[in-house]
Design a protein with these regions (language model features):
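Short, structured active-site "lid" loops
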Residues: 52-74
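Short, conserved beta-strand edge motifs with alternating hydrophobic and charged residues
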Residues: 16, 40-42, 68-72
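Compact, glycine-rich, soluble single-domain proteins
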Residues: 70-91
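Short active-site oxyanion
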Residues: 12-13, 64-68, 87-89
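C-terminal binding/interaction regions
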Residues: 2-8, 12-27, 96-163
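A short, Lys/Arg-enriched amphipathic alpha-helix followed by its capping loop at the start of a domain
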Residues: 24-36
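A short beta-strand-loop structural module common to alpha/beta enzyme folds
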Residues: 36-49
């Protein structure tokens, strides 16, 4: 999934969010609908960031013609949770440049944004994420990242030194 060239234009958008976005949800629905078919992936009875991240990421894993957008208070919890799913490459973006670079270099397939950001900024970030194409850059690095997913990592050991 990560090796596909091109942009996310025309793909299905799986959208997950938590309670922080609920008051302005209609505005986000409208903004996202300008870019394609939006499928809300939330548990309407429990607007919890982990539940939304799980629903969006499992949908993106099984639907190669899609990508995800996750929005919570800061975007950090969603990005941490999303990156635990095999084949998901989530990026928390706080600027248009972040969105462009995570697509151009890392071919991210899930965008994480902060509900606490200015709406106009988030709209610009979303547009950049969707319209920026992955062109095949840094392929060796992406292959290495993909190998991390299946690796059995040894536990980290802390080394304490006294002065």
């Amino acid at each position: 999934m990560i090796r596909r060239l091109g942009s996310h234009v025309g793909k299905r958008i799986y959208f997950g969010y938590d309670r922080y976005i609920a008051p302005i949800l209609p505005t986000y629905r409208e903004a996202l609908s300008l870019h394609g078919k939006v499928i809300e992936a939330v548990d309407e009875y429990q607007l919890h960031y982990l539940t939304s991240a799980e629903l969006v990421c499992t949908a993106v894993q099984t639907d190669p013609e899609s990508f995800g957008i996750l929005c919570c208070g800061t975007g950090m919890g969603m990005s941490i949770a999303a990156n635990k799913f095999t084949g998901i490459y989530a990026a928390r973006c706080v600027s248009v440049e972040d969105a462009e670079m995570c697509r151009t270099i890392n071919n991210a397939n899930v965008l994480c944004i902060a509900a606490k950001n200015d709406l106009a900024l988030n709209r610009a970030i979303i547009g950049a994420f969707i319209n920026t194409a992955y062109t095949g850059r840094k392929l060796e690095e992406l292959e290495r990242i993909t190998r991390f997913e299946g690796a059995e990592l040894l536990p980290l050991r802390a080394v304490l030194r006294t002065a």
